[in-house]
């Protein structure tokens, strides 16, 4: 959106001029937004709301379910109109964090409540310049699906899946050479899969900027070697050619259709799309590691706008929604993982699996302690910087320029943007 900085400047001015009125737990209504939970989880959400309202007689919670495709724009419009939700599950956090429109959870959440949360999620998606602005909710941790039949057809041992990224690429090349299928179903688009900055982090190259964010560190031989590895894999057709511009769920379809032999994913919910024939071929295992030694994780988060007149009550409801018991119950209903310590340690995640989906979820759950949250750098203007990284990396993948040329251009463009901060 071209006028986004202007809109947020207006918001900052409006917030400073119209402070929220004092709160009281007497006849207030909290507006609560979720993303695409209305169809499958209405009973779960409504039960939580009813329980909370019963314990807080003066509070009512108005639940609004928003589609994923429109939530960021709808949230922005609500801020501009000075009528935001009190508690919201949103995407595109960097867009909002840099403009100081969200309440600090470090300020409103007591230390004993923070301690209940897994630290990688508390200091994850909403951690910006030393402060956390989100309440972590449900999460996902990557594991790997692979196709037994394609492994066997390529002469690979189906009982010995790859343990590292390099092994995954090597097996992917063998599969491509011997079967004509792609080795790995992987999306490289920043809004869908693992973008270039996450690829660098997986292999141990981090941070991307110096301590005072005055210049980038990305133009490094280490970064060049990591990105070259991916360019080589793309050119060797280990990855499908559509990986750069993949649409939502394309990577899942490539795997299920037998076009690709391996699919890094998060748990077992995709088994709903497996037929009996494919169930016999699909095997779950741990996510292959890069040099970092950790696996990627993501999590859904809740935010409270500063403009809410009910910040404290919204935070209280958010903590109730995301407590151990409620997160564990959510995980029993869906192939997701919790973001609290007690829930993550529950025997439910380590029980004997009853299905293929359970097997996959167990691999994800066992790697919660070995995960890092795929949070982008906490720097102003990151959205534009990420676009630059994607554009230049895409040109390198397409052999329109070398990796070194891409890094030179990224460095120049990023440092130019940093000079204005």
Please describe what each predicted stretch is.
Residues 145-147, 297-310:
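A bilobed periplasmic-binding-protein/Venus flytrap-type ligand-binding module shared by bacterial periplasmic
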Residues 171-174, 212-244, 274:
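Glycine-centered hinge/linker elements that transmit conformational signals in sensory
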Residues 106-119, 161, 186, 204-225, ...:
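Short, solvent-exposed loop/beta-turn-alpha elements that line the ligand-binding surface or hinge
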Residues 133-137, 142, 167-216, 260:
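Extracytoplasmic/periplasmic solute-binding protein
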Residues 283, 333-391, 395, 420:
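Long, aromatic- and glycine/proline-rich binding clefts that accommodate carbohydrate-like moieties
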Residues 26-39, 59-64, 86-87, 133:
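Short, well-ordered beta-strand elements
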Residues 91-143, 169, 195-200, 279-283, ...:
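Hinge/lid segment of periplasmic solute-binding proteins
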Residues 51-120, 127, 153-155, 160-163, ...:
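Extracytoplasmic "Venus flytrap"/periplasmic binding protein-like
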């Amino acid at each position: 959106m071209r006028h986004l900085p202007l809109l947020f400047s207006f918001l900052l001015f409006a917030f400073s001029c119209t402070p929220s009125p004092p709160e009281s737990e007497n006849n207030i209504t909290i507006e609560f937004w979720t993303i695409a939970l209305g169809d499958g989880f209405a009973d779960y959400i409504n039960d939580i709301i009813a329980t909370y309202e019963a314990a807080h007689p003066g509070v009512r919670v108005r639940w609004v379910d928003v589609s994923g495709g429109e939530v960021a724009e709808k949230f922005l419009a609500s801020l501009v109109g000075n009528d935001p939700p009190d508690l919201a599950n949103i995407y595109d956090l960097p867009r909002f964090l840099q403009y100081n429109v969200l309440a600090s959870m470090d300020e409103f959440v007591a230390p004993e409540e923070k301690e209940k949360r897994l630290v990688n999620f508390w200091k994850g998606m909403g951690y910006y310049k030393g402060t956390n602005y989100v309440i972590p909710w449900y999460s996902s941790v990557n594991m790997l699906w692979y196709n037994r039949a394609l492994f066997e057809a390529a002469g690979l041992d189906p009982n010995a899946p790859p343990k590292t990224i390099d092994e995954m690429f090597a097996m992917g090349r063998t599969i491509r050479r011997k079967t004509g299928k792609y080795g790995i179903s992987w999306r490289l688009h920043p809004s869908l899969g693992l973008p270039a900055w996450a690829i660098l982090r997986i292999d141990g190259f981090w941070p991307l900027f110096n301590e005072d964010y005055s210049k980038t560190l990305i133009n490094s031989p280490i970064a060049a070697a990591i990105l070259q590895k991916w360019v080589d894999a793309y050119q060797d057709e280990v990855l499908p050619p559509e990986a750069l511009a993949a649409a939502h769920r394309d990577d899942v379809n490539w795997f299920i259709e037998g076009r690709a032999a391996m699919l890094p994913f998060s748990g077992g919910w995709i088994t709903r799309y497996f037929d009996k024939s494919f169930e016999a071929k699909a095997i779950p295992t741990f996510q292959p590691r890069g040099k970092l030694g950790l696996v990627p994780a993501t999590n859904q988060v809740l935010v409270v706008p500063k403009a809410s007149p009910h910040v404290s009550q919204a935070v209280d409801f958010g903590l109730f929604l995301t407590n151990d018991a409620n997160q564990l119950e959510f995980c029993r209903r869906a192939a997701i993982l919790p973001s609290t310590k007690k829930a993550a340690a529950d025997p439910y995640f380590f029980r004997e699996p009853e299905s293929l989906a359970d097997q996959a979820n167990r691999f994800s759950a066992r790697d919660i302690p070995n995960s890092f949250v795929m949070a982008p750098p906490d720097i102003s203007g990151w959205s534009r910087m990420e676009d630059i990284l994607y554009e230049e990396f895409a040109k390198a993948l397409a052999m329109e320029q070398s990796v070194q040329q891409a890094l030179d251009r990224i460095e120049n463009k990023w440092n130019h943007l940093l000079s204005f901060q």
